[in-house]
Amino acid sequence: MDLLFLGTSAGVPTKARNVSATAVIEASGSHWYLVDCGEGTQHRLLHTPLSIRDLRAIFITHVHGDHCFGLPGLLASAGMSGRTQPLEVILPAVLHDWVRQGLVASDTFLPFELRLLPVEELIAWRSETLQVTTVQLSHRVPSVGFVFTEINPEPRLDIQRLDAEGITRGPLWGELAKGLTVTYDGQLLNGNDYLRPSRPPRRVIVCGDNDKPELLAAVARGADVLVHEATFTQAVVERTGGTFGHSTAAEVARFAEAAGVRNLVLTHFSARYQNDPRRSPHIDNVRDEALAHYSGQLTLAQDLQRYHLGRNGLLEASA
C-alpha cells in the first residue's frame, strides 16, 4: 500500500500545507481511498497522478470543517469528470443532509449514485482487497480512526489443497489462479477458495483528531503504519495552556513505541510550525520531540509526498 498526503495542516491551510486529506492507495495501484477531505482537496489532486474515477470510497473522521469542507466540490468535480460508478462516502450522520442540501442548493447533478453511509454504524467496509474498520477516538466532537487491513494479499494458488482434492494440473489451474469460477468433474469451483495470501496482510491506521492515543491500543499493536495527528509540541502546550482536543508529538511517540508500531507518520501540524529554519517554532521541533520517545521509522508527512510501504516493512518516500 501507498499513502499520498494531500493536506497536513491543522485547522487552516498555510502556504506549504493544505488542510486534512490522505489518500490510501491499493498495492495494485489501480484504486485508492480518501480519508478526510478538507477545503481545496480537489486542487491538491490536480498535482498527483490520482484520478477521481479510480476513487473507491471516501471516509470522513469527524465533522470539523478542516476535514470535510472540500467534499461538495470534490463530488461535483467527480460528476463533471464523467464518473458513472457508484461512490460510497462514510461520514458522520449529521453531515448527510449538509452534503445533500449543498448539492441540491447549488443545482449540482451527479451522474453516479452517491451512497452516504453513517460512520457511527460502520462495522466493516470491504472491497476485493481491503477491509476498513473504525476505532473510536477522543476529541471535542466524536472522531474516529480508520483501520485499513489487506484481504488475501498477493494471492497464490493453494497447491496443497488442489492436490489433496485431486484437481488435475492444467489450464484450469490458471483460471482458478485468477479467482474465476470453473467447472471440474461436474462441480463448480470458486477460484477464491483456492487462493491463499503469499504474505501476512498489512495494517494501516489513519486517525482523525485525537487527544488520547491510548485508545488505539487494541488495533495499533504491531500495526505496519500509524498515521496520527501531532498538532502541538509540549513546549507550545505549556505556553498556550491546553491541547484543545489534540495530541502532542511526545504523547503519540510514547504510545507508538509502547505499541510496537513499525512506522509512525505524524501529520495535522499547527500552522505555527514553520518550514523556514530562521523562524520559531520550527517543524523540526515536532520531529525532535517525537524522536526522543520513538525508535521506529518516523515520518513527518509532507503535502503531495507519496510514501510506499515496502516488502521490508519500512515506509519510505517515493521518488
From Swiss-Prot:
InterPro entries for this protein: Metallo-B-lactamas, RibonucZ/Hydroxyglut_hydro, RNase_Z/BN
Output the Pfam families linked to this UniProt entry. Lactamase_B_2
EC number(s) on record? 3.1.26.11
Name the needed cofactors.
Zn(2+)
Catalytic residues in the record:
66
Tell me which domain of life the UniProt entry assigns to the organism this sequence originates from: Bacteria
Signal peptide feature range: none
- Return the protein name: Ribonuclease Z
Q: What organism is listed for this UniProt entry?
A: Pseudomonas putida (strain ATCC 47054 / DSM 6125 / CFBP 8728 / NCIMB 11950 / KT2440)
